[in-house]
Amino acid sequence: MVWWVVRTQGVARRKQLMAAGISAEWEAILARNLPPYDSLPAEAQKTLQGYIAVFLDEKQFEGCGGQEITDEVRVSVAAQACLLLIGRKEATCYPKLRSVLVYPHTYVAGGKGIFGAQNDAPSTRLGESWQTGVVVLSWNSVTGGARNFDDGHNVVLHEFAHQLDQEDGAADGAPKLESWSSYGSWARCLSGEYRSFLKRVAKHKRTVIDEYGATNPAEFFATATEAFFEKPEQLERKRPELYEELKRYYQVDPRQWEF
């Protein structure tokens, strides 16, 4: 009974926040740090603002390594993260995510790997997504991704694609889909595209998707998401079946956004 009351209150609050949107000051940050924003239809802009409001209400931000957490940081991260949600009309906003840790620059980390698993080898990182409800980002990578929104590299899109992938408890490149019938098409398309991608990378051929996607299916989904939102025309031309599958999943067509 208590669980039901808490859940109902959460749903009601999200609806209220979605309807209210964000302040003019926050929208100015949004427009400045998310190049596609001005090209979005009015309804999509309103939906994005609503998700940003929910995101900033529910998620905690923590500065690391001397990074100050300002509205610029919070809104910029939330805007890019919530771009992944605007077509899907989710009732929740990254439900398993609790905290976003932000470093000023790339950072060296060991212990936990990109999916929260133990990994003793320290490495320099731009960001991480943990299954324990944490995303880690470097602020200079966030701003770099915002400035160059057509290069196919965006740490926020990448790590939050991992969050979507991890919602079902597994980081395997297969996020929760709309219906059971969708999984067959997804598996056939993504597995075939992944195999084809591995062959091109092995032959050192140029690819629209970052070569890091060859690491495993989870990284392929994350890097394909970056290409889908940032290089949609190229991805559709080179990998039309993959583009259509991602378009069905995200319920948007970034080719229509001119910026």
Regions found by a protein language model. Name each.
Residues 2-24:
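Transmembrane-cytosolic junction motif
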Residues 18-58:
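Amphipathic alpha-helical packing elements
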Residues 41, 151-167, 222:
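Active-site recognition of the HExxH zinc-binding catalytic motif
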Residues 42-43, 67-73, 211-219:
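Structural motif
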Residues 46-109:
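Extended cationic-aromatic binding surfaces that line active-site or macromolecule-binding grooves
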Residues 78-94, 102-150, 170-259:
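Metalloprotease/metallohydrolase-associated module, dominated by Zn2+-dependent proteases
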